[in-house]
Design a protein with these regions (language model features):
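A bilobed periplasmic-binding-protein/Venus flytrap-type ligand-binding module shared by bacterial periplasmic
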Residues: 1, 39, 110-122, 141-144
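Extracytoplasmic ligand-binding site segments that recognize negatively charged/polar headgroups
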Residues: 1-78, 89
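Solvent-exposed loop/turn segments at secondary-structure junctions
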Residues: 1-2, 26-29, 84-87, 105-108, ...
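Periplasmic-binding protein-like
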Residues: 18-27, 50-54, 60-61, 65, 93-118, 132-154, ...
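A ligand-binding cleft/hinge motif common to bilobed small-molecule-binding domains
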Residues: 72, 76-97, 146
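Substrate/cofactor-recognition hotspot
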Residues: 129
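C-terminal capping/gating helix-and-loop segments adjacent to ligand/active sites or protein-protein/ligand interfaces
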Residues: 139-195
Length: 195
């Protein structure tokens, strides 16, 4: 796609034949991230954005794999995915056709975490694993196995095709207390707008 939309408003303004695939926020972390993204970017205007997206949504899938598969099969023009998806195609498949579409309003980050359960019987082993996971050696594995940005600056050790991909210029966030208090309402409003 030579000129992808650069905002949700630009996406909404496209002809209804322009289709996207998104994930269900009740069963998919990218789907939940989409709800938070629109809420963070548009606040009280979020329902208006969801209503505008409705004619463009080909389907809402249970998870990312189904959505991305439909996109790869040519069923939709765009898919809600990770900004690192193009790096996967470039590195693993030597396919440079895919790109991340930066949106002017910014992007929400999906941060994956690791921790130790209180009930762990192997706390020392878990601590050693977490120390390794957050070390440079452990983080060198993340870009090309989990296809996410590392939590440490790898400098020249970041694969060239991974580092060459566009990254969001503006990251949005939603206050944790607000997510706890409002996420169910936001999810329900999004799903209702898409019915």
């Amino acid at each position: 796609m030579p000129n992808p939309p650069a905002s949700f408003e630009e996406l909404i303004a496209l002809p209804p034949s322009f289709k996207i695939v998104i994930e269900d926020p009740r069963s998919s972390t990218p789907g939940l991230g989409n709800v938070l993204w629109i809420q963070a970017a548009y606040g009280d205007r979020a329902p208006e954005i969801w209503a505008g997206l409705k004619p463009h949504v080909l389907t809402v899938t249970r998870g990312w794999s189904e959505a991305y598969g439909l996109f790869l099969d040519g069923e939709a023009d765009m898919v809600l995915s990770y900004t690192t998806s193009p790096a996967y195609h470039a590195i693993a498949e030597n396919d440079h056709r895919f790109a991340f579409a930066p949106f002017k309003e910014g992007h929400i980050a999906q941060i994956e975490v690791a921790g130790i359960l209180k009930t762990s019987e192997k706390t020392d082993l878990a601590k050693r694993f977490l120390a390794y996971l957050t070390s440079v050696a452990g983080q060198k594995l993340i870009p090309t196995t989990n296809w996410m940005y590392p939590v440490v600056d790898l400098g020249a050790d970041l694969p060239t095709d991974f580092g060459a991909q566009s990254k969001p210029e503006k990251l949005l966030s939603v206050d944790e207390a607000q997510i706890t208090a409002q996420s169910r309402t936001w999810i329900d409003a999004a799903l209702q707008a898409l019915e």
